[in-house]
């Protein structure tokens, strides 16, 4: 099974790439953690933001193969504790489908992406910077795996 983070935005600072890779390399090979970056359309003061969101959504969905699970990260999603995330991760693992975790751009996800979502997850009611979200997701996936495997990382 693969866990794939599909996120709008590229060219992240080095600390973001290092943070993401640190947790991705800790994951076992049977739960590979992969990052797919969707380029962010340049926003100007007269930008057609609705069109950009739609284009970004189309690009995100183009990375998803038929039958794969889509989990959107949304403010209105369901908050999961670490233990609840571990339960979800175990369900996903038993389901054996690739899980695509979708993170939109500054204005959020396209409605078409949300409509395809099987689950909606909220990391926090706080507004989080997108670079930090990548690291948080990587760390939380690793932490959930350690809960399932009895590893002492999560105490």
From Swiss-Prot:
One Pfam family of this chain: SPOUT_MTase
Keyword terms: Cytoplasm, Methyltransferase, rRNA processing, S-adenosyl-L-methionine, Transferase
Cellular component per GO, a single term: cytoplasm
Record localization: Cytoplasm
Domain of life of the source: Bacteria
Catalytic activity entry: pseudouridine(1915) in 23S rRNA + S-adenosyl-L-methionine = N(3)-methylpseudouridine(1915) in 23S rRNA + S-adenosyl-L-homocysteine + H(+)
Keyword flag rRNA processing: yes
Keyword Cytoplasm listed: yes
Enzyme Commission number(s) of this protein: 2.1.1.177
GO molecular function, one term: rRNA (pseudouridine-N3-)-methyltransferase activity
Residues annotated as binding S-adenosyl-L-methionine: 73, 104, 123-128
Subunit description: Homodimer.
Family affiliation: Belongs to the RNA methyltransferase RlmH family.
Function (record text): Specifically methylates the pseudouridine at position 1915 (m3Psi1915) in 23S rRNA.
PANTHER family documented for this protein: METHYLTRANSFERASE, RIBOSOMAL RNA LARGE SUBUNIT METHYLTRANSFERASE H
Identification of the protein by name: Ribosomal RNA large subunit methyltransferase H
Gene of this entry: rlmH
């Amino acid at each position: 099974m693969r866990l794939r983070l599909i996120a709008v935005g590229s060219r992240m600072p080095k600390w973001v790439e290092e943070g993401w890779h640190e947790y991705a390399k800790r994951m076992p090979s049977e739960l590979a953690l992969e990052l797919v970056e969707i380029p962010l359309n340049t926003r100007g003061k007269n930008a057609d933001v609705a069109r950009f969101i739609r284009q970004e959504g189309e690009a995100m969905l183009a990375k998803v193969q038929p039958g794969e699970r889509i989990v959107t990260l949304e403010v209105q999603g369901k908050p999961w504790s670490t233990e609840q995330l571990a339960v979800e991760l175990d369900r996903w693992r038993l389901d054996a489908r690739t899980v695509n975790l979708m993170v939109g751009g500054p204005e959020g996800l396209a409605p078409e992406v949300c409509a395809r979502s099987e689950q909606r997850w909220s990391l926090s009611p706080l507004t989080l910077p997108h670079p930090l979200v990548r690291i948080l997701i990587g760390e939380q996936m690793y932490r959930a795996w350690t809960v399932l495997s009895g590893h002492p990382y999560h105490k």
